């Protein structure tokens, strides 16, 4: 399309009036949320100096956000209404609004941005990717008048953000001060020095690209270039420079490029061709150090690496906002600080995004582990290691990809913080996993050993406990290491389980030691049961054969009958032999448990003490009052009722019953002091119990001693002597036992006397006939009544059994003794009653001092004692 040069004062808007400010571009407001509002660009800063918060939205829609450093920023300067927007539209295919031919007034307000839209088919003429073009409000406009505040602020903003500053001037303005924008360029130089003062470590180079419009060619471009450079150098020399920069030149901070464009209205075709040629220069370029030192102008690609501000595209909007905030508030612009602030902002933002993705992968594992802890369950998380490794690598890689383009110091610090946060959570999961594997492994190990032992016991075969422990320990360690290796996260200092493995091995050793001790306790219990069974039979036989005076029951079938005086010797020898056999069994079995010498010593020491306790209890059981009295009576009856050949005696009145009774009774009475103390006959002293038990092993613990019964003469702290330990019956019990035995012996004696007398007297025969005649009705009633008959039958059976056991005498004797005891108690209660009442006390006071004992009389009025004496006779 061919345009004629518009006449002065006749330009106006060419865009539709319905599209907001400047005709085409989205400004701040609700329309910014509509993607179609960004089709032609975005107003970065409006005429009221407000920054557009939707700049990042525009960059995202233009696919610039993910470009990293692969983008370029160009700003255009120039006087108002000099065709800056028209130039940009032809160079980059943008649609900045331009003035119409009908009126002349300000069109660009504030600062606008648009992405390059030009497409070149020729690869050699192809522009760089992602070129962002900023159209800056023109200077020297009548709308702002003498207010140059925005002019200075916009220049500072453009210089802080742009790589290339296009200065749009007309050829006839070269050599002028205001017309050639020298005032604006002086502002640019001043703000550049201001930036340098804040960052002396970095030289912010920029390219000033002078596009000379309406270039006729009469004056060579080289001459125009020389004129402009002289004017610029003079302006630079006039600036007040900071200390140390007095001799600096303009070429230390700026590069220059020049290009002339024909008149757009008079030579439209040439203008279009030259504009296309000029556009091809906006690509990446290179130049050597020599050209830079010579200050040669840029002839080829204008985007040199040193021009780039090194702000990643995804952080540019925030960076630009921070820059403008500093500028608009008249604060000293500190680009390094702004870059660091941007880096902190973007790194924090990227870190949050990365952590959010990290949470999706790790949070479910954390919740499962926490739920297991709350429930008290051991939860081993499957696939945890792979999830942790993948989540960490992905998080760090994503952060590195997005954040490494920013300030290195901030990036490295934020990366360390991110890794610290991630590693803190992963370490907690890792430790929790190892802890669960630890506890679960110990429990499984204990259960496996116990089950293997039980299986061996059920089979009844001998099992090797040490081999079981060895195999299960190996399996437990393999399971733990497998789980630990699967949970490792490479590249982290905390991902190491050597210390945890040592603790696990230590706990397995402790558990195996406890299991071995428990097994040895069970072994000791089994051996103790065996000892108890053997001693129970052996000791019972000794006491059953105690003092047998006949060759029948109670006497050995072969050999000589045992001596009563050596009963304790025989019991001690049996006890020592039994325990010695038990010790051999215990030692052999404990060796298969891989028990240490100390553990075996403690086990044998406990076995001896426990065995003595078993013997002591068995002896006390046999020596219980009822059992001992019965054994003494049997001993007495064996000697009294049977002769030396073991033949039962048939008592006759002519037999020396009194002599036999006295000898048998005295012989039996000698057993009471013999049985009262566990003394050996050879030295009439207690057995060497203290020497036999031995001293307490040094390796014995309090737990080994807590269930042991103190032994007198062995345990000094018990305060009990060996003599007291072997005393079975004290003096009181001996006396009581003697009295009771004599009464029992007397009953046997009386029965024998009655038996001798009863053998002579006979019941008359007529008595049986009389009994039958008088009791016929009663006999018939009993026979006809089943209840009476059954009762009679039971009584007959009971009487027969009593007769066969020869218990009628003892029963009658016990009944007589019980009746006498009851009578004595009745007298005692009656006396207490009388003493308690007033009448009784008076009666007792009136009675004489003499007392008379009440005697038992028979039906004939004779005393019972007299009748007994007559019977003896």
UniProtKB/Swiss-Prot annotation:
It is found in: Endoplasmic reticulum membrane. The keyword Endoplasmic reticulum applies. One of its GO terms (molecular function) is GTPase activity. Residues 691-716, 839-873 are annotated as: Disordered. SUPFAM superfamilies: P-loop containing nucleoside triphosphate hydrolases. InterPro entries: G_GB1_RHD3_dom (IPR030386), P-loop_NTPase (IPR027417), RHD3/Sey1 (IPR008803), Sey1/RHD3-like_3HB (IPR046758). It is a multi-pass membrane protein. Residues 462-519, 812-839 form a coiled coil. Residues 1-762, 808-873 are cytoplasmic. The keyword GTP-binding applies. One of its GO terms (biological process) is endoplasmic reticulum membrane fusion. Gene3D superfamilies: P-loop containing nucleotide triphosphate hydrolases. GTP binds at residues 78-85. HAMAP family: Sey1. This is Protein sey1.
């Amino acid at each position: 399309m061919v345009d004629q040069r518009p006449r002065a004062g006749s330009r106006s808007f060419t865009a539709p009036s319905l599209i907001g400010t400047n005709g085409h571009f989205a400004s701040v407001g609700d329309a910014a949320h509509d993607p179609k509002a960004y089709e032609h660009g975005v107003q970065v800063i409006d005429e009221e100096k407000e920054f557009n918060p939707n700049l990042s939205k525009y960059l995202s829609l233009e696919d610039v956000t993910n470009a990293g450093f692969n983008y370029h920023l160009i700003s255009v300067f120039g006087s108002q209404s000099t065709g800056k927007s028209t130039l940009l539209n032809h160079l980059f295919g943008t649609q900045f609004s331009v003035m119409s031919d009908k009126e002349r007034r300000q069109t660009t307000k504030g600062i606008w941005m648009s992405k390059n839209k030009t497409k070149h088919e020729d690869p050699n003429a192809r522009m760089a990717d992602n070129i962002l073009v900023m159209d800056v409000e023109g200077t020297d406009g009548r709308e702002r008048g003498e207010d140059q505040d925005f002019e200075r602020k916009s220049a500072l903003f453009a210089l802080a953000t742009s790589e290339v500053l296009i200065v749009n001037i007309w050829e006839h303005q070269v050599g002028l001060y205001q017309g050639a924008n020298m005032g604006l360029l002086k502002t640019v130089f001043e703000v550049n020095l201001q930036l340098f003062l804040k960052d002396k470590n970095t030289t912010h180079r920029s390219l000033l690209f002078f596009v000379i419009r309406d270039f006729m060619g009469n004056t060579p471009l080289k001459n125009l270039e020389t004129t402009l450079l002289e004017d610029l150098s003079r302006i630079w020399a006039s600036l007040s420079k900071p200390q140390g920069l007095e001799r600096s030149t303009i070429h230390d901070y700026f590069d220059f490029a020049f290009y002339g464009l024909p008149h757009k209205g008079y030579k439209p075709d040439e203008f279009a061709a030259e504009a296309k040629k000029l556009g091809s220069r906006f690509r990446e370029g290179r130049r050597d150090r020599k050209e830079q030192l010579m200050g040669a102008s840029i002839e080829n690609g204008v985007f040199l690496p040193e021009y780039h501000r090194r702000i990643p595209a995804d952080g540019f909007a925030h960076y630009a906002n921070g820059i403008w905030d500093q500028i608009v508030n008249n604060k000293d612009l500190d680009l390094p600080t702004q870059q660091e602030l941007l880096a902190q902002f973007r790194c924090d933002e990227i870190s949050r995004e990365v952590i959010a993705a990290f949470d999706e992968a790790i949070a479910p594992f954390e919740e499962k582990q926490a739920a297991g802890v709350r429930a008290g369950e051991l939860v081993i998380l499957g696939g945890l290691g792979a999830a942790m490794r993948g989540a960490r690598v992905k998080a760090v890689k994503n952060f590195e990809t997005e954040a490494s383009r920013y300030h290195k110091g901030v990036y490295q610090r934020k990366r360390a913080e991110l890794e610290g946060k991630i590693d803190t959570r992963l370490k907690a999961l890792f430790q929790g996993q190892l802890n669960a594997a630890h506890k679960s492994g110990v429990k499984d190990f204990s259960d496996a050993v116990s089950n293997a032992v039980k299986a061996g016991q059920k089979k009844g075969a001998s099992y090797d406990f040490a081999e079981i422990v060895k195999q299960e320990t190996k399996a437990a360690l393999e399971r733990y290491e497998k789980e630990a290796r699967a949970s490792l996260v490479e590249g982290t200092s905390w991902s190491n389980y050597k210390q945890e493995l040592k603790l696990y091995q230590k706990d397995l050793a402790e558990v195996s030691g406890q299991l071995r001790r428990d097994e040895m306790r069970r072994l000791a219990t089994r051996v103790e049961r065996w000892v108890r069974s053997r001693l129970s039979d052996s000791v019972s036989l000794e006491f059953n054969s105690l003092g047998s005076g006949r060759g029948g029951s109670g006497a050995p079938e072969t050999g000589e009958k045992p001596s009563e005086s050596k009963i304790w010797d025989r019991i001690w020898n049996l006890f020592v032999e039994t325990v010695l056999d038990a010790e051999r069994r215990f030692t052999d079995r404990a060796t298969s448990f891989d028990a240490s010498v100390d553990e075996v010593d403690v086990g044998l020491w406990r076995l001896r003490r426990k065995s003595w306790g078993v013997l002591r209890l068995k002896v006390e059981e046999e020596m219980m009052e009822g059992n001992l009295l019965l054994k003494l009576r049997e001993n007495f009856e064996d000697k009294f009722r049977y002769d030396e050949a073991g033949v039962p005696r048939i008592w006759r009145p002519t037999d020396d019953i009194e002599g036999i009774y006295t000898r048998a009774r005295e012989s039996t009475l000698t057993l009471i002091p013999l049985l009262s103390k566990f003394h050996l006959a050879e030295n009439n002293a207690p057995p060497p119990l203290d020497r036999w038990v031995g001293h307490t092993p040094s390796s014995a613990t309090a737990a080994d001693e807590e269930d042991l019964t103190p032994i007198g003469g062995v345990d000094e702290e018990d305060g009990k002597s060996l003599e007291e330990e072997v005393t079975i019956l004290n003096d009181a019990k001996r006396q009581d036992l003697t009295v009771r035995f004599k009464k029992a012996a007397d009953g046997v004696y009386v029965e024998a006397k009655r038996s001798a007398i009863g053998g002579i007297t006979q019941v008359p025969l007529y008595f049986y006939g009389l009994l039958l005649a008088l009791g016929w009705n009663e006999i018939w009633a009993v026979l006809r009544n089943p209840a009476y008959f059954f009762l009679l039958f039971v009584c007959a059976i009971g009487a027969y059994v009593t007769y066969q056991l020869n218990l009628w005498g003892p029963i009658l004797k016990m009944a007589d003794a019980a009746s006498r005891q009851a009578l004595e108690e009745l007298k005692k209660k009656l006396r207490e009653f009388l003493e308690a009442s007033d009448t009784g006390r008076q009666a007792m006071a009136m009675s004489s001092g003499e007392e008379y004992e009440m005697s038992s009389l028979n039906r004939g009025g004779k005393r019972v004692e007299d009748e007994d004496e007559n019977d003896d006779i």
